[in-house]
Structure formats: structure tokens, C-alpha cells
């Protein structure tokens, strides 16, 4: 199991300057961005940076070369984690056309599953909800909305009698600039606590919105587990509470397929972040089925997120 691995990669902006490396006795730069690739164990706890290059997009050719080199030294690549900003990679592999895996070039019997980064997707859910608003089905042809004003209303109502969401503040909905890069504020907004607060303060008037927030929360917990066992089924490793975890993924799939944007309700075509969520759900189920054949019983899904930026700090 130690050789079962996932590739994650990220293209990061850097200060455009010229630097002299004293140890290598060479000059680097100027460069606007750096491409970093990391391999990490999916079952065993290890990770290693294997590629760094400047002004380099992740392409299909480069990715397959990296996979082949890993496989040659005995590392089995089962998945690839990335954010939705890798346009060249996404386009060349036709990921937005519902392609969620490719045959492994070293062993066509195994697949490499694509995983758009769950924290990045959560931030995009938050951004679109606050900026455009979501329109959600409420049965019998009716709809309800969920957007900035609804969260603002909750924040102002919470605390008048009892404060259910102590972490939720105006900063969570007035996010601009670099603040939008923080995953924790998006997680607070779409948390189980927020879901319960909507129900407590507004009763059945916000029943649909409360359920949607909880659906997002369960999906993110399922895609971000870091311990084998947890009091919350969705926070346990994937496979430990398989029935409830699979149900959480399919609930999110249904929610994403049915949601519309309040500024353009008639538009039914999915945009990039919605497709990314649907791809990640299909990949999680497919990857787990593949790993089961090798005797793997559970997966810590946090190892399927993009983690390269942490290595650069």
C-alpha cells in the first residue's frame, strides 16, 4: 500500500525578479510563475516534491511523462489533484466534458482519476453564492433563493435571543481580495452550525436553504477527511461509513445539477466550478472501487486535495 500515490500540482505566482543561487552558481529568472508537482502516499503518510519549473504550464505531455517516471520506480499513480485554474491541463484532458479519469499509461488496467481541489471548489461555491446568489428548487415548480442578503440577515438575527453561530461575522460575507483565498471562512459559512441556525431563527421559511448549506457541508467533510474515525460519519475516512458518505456525495450531485444562479435563472448550462464538483464526486466513487480491488478499505480524502502551496511556505 505504501506505493499507492496521488500526484498534485499547482501553478503559483511569484515575484518577477532575477536571483543568483550561490550553491548552484547560476541565475534564475525573471519568471512570473512556478509550476510545482508533488507525489504523496494515498494510503501511507509520505509526500515528496518531484518537479519544479518556472513559467511552465501543466500540459498533457508533461503530466504523462511524470506519471511514467513515477511508475517506472514502482510508485502507482491512482489520482491527480489540481485546481480549476489549470486551463491547459483541463482542456487537453477534456475534463470539463465530463472526463473524470484516464487509463494509466503504464498499466491500462488501472485508471488515474481527476480530483479538482475540494477547498478551491468550496471557495468558488461561496464566491458565486455571495456574488450572484443561488436559486434552489422548492417543489411543485417553486423556488427559493440563497445569497448574501440571507447570510447577512442570519448574522444580524443571531445573538438577539441566543447566539448559535459565534464564528460567523460580517467578515464572512464581505470577503474581498486575498480574504477570498481563506478556506476556513468559506467552511464557516457552509457549516452544519449555519444550517441549524437558519432553521432555528427562520423555521420552515429557510428549510430549503438550510438543507442546501448542510448538503455542501457534508460533501466537503466527505472530501476532506483526515482521520479514520470521527463522530461525524462524513468526517471519517471514506469507506468507514460508506453508505452515509456515498449518500452525501449523491445529495451534493443532485443539488449542483438542480441549482441555478439568481442573476440568470434560465441558464441551465453548468459553469466550471459545478462541473468540477461533479467530476470530483464521480472520481471519488471510481477511485474507491479501484482501490477496493487492491484490498484498501478506506481513504483519507484530504490526501486528494492540492497541497503544493503548503510545501512552498
PLM regions: where:
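Structured nucleic-acid-interacting core domains from mobile-element enzymes and related host factors
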Residues: 1-44
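Non-catalytic regulatory appendages
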Residues: 34, 47-313
